[in-house]
Regions:
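Substrate-recognition element of Asp-dependent hydrolases with the DxDx(T/V) motif
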Residues: 1-13
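Short secondary-structure boundary segments
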Residues: 3, 29, 61, 79-82, ...
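Phosphate- and divalent-cation-binding pockets in alpha/beta enzyme and binding domains
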Residues: 8-11, 43, 67, 107-108
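Conserved H-loop
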Residues: 19-23, 51
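Conserved Lys-Pro-Asp/Glu-containing loop-to-beta segment of HAD-superfamily phosphomonoesterases
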Residues: 34-65
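Acidic, Mg2+-coordinating phosphoryl-transfer loop and its flanking beta/alpha structural elements
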Residues: 57-96
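Short acidic-hydrophobic, aromatic-tinged amphipathic segments that line or gate anion-handling sites
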Residues: 97-101
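Short amphipathic alpha-helix with an adjacent loop that forms part of the alpha/beta core around
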Residues: 105-115
Length: 116
């Protein structure tokens, strides 16, 4: 789920050679309401047949976190990306977790698996 248009997001994933890791891409053009409205997240979860409580949503912008929380997903703020400078301190976003680098995701997933 991205704020970019779907076709642009797909082009970026192709250019980065990571598109094979994504089952579904939904951009802002496929939903009536932009984030922080949870429409795009709910649409992706429905398409993937995943309950929001079983999902982790990573976001670099406060609107990502608000959207994740609005649909009951685990909201994980990330320090890489664009949002922190525009949205104030990441610690004020009310995310369930904050990741400093992509490598921190695996330990978080393992920790969350232990709780279930």
């Amino acid at each position: 789920v991205t704020g970019k248009y779907t076709n642009l997001a797909k082009l970026l994933l192709d250019k980065l050679k990571i598109s094979q890791y994504f089952d579904y891409v939904i951009g802002s053009d496929l939903c009536e309401h932009p984030k922080p409205h949870p429409c795009s997240l709910k649409k992706a979860l429905d398409k993937l047949n995943v309950d929001s409580k079983d999902s982790i949503y990573l976001g670099d912008h406060i609107n990502d976190i608000k959207a994740a929380l609005a649909c009951n997903a685990y909201a994980c703020a990330v320090r890489w990306g664009y949002g922190e400078g525009d949205c104030g301190k990441i610690e004020t976003w009310k995310a369930n977790a904050i990741l400093d680098k992509p490598q921190d995701l695996i330990p978080l997933i393992r920790k969350l698996e232990l709780k279930t």
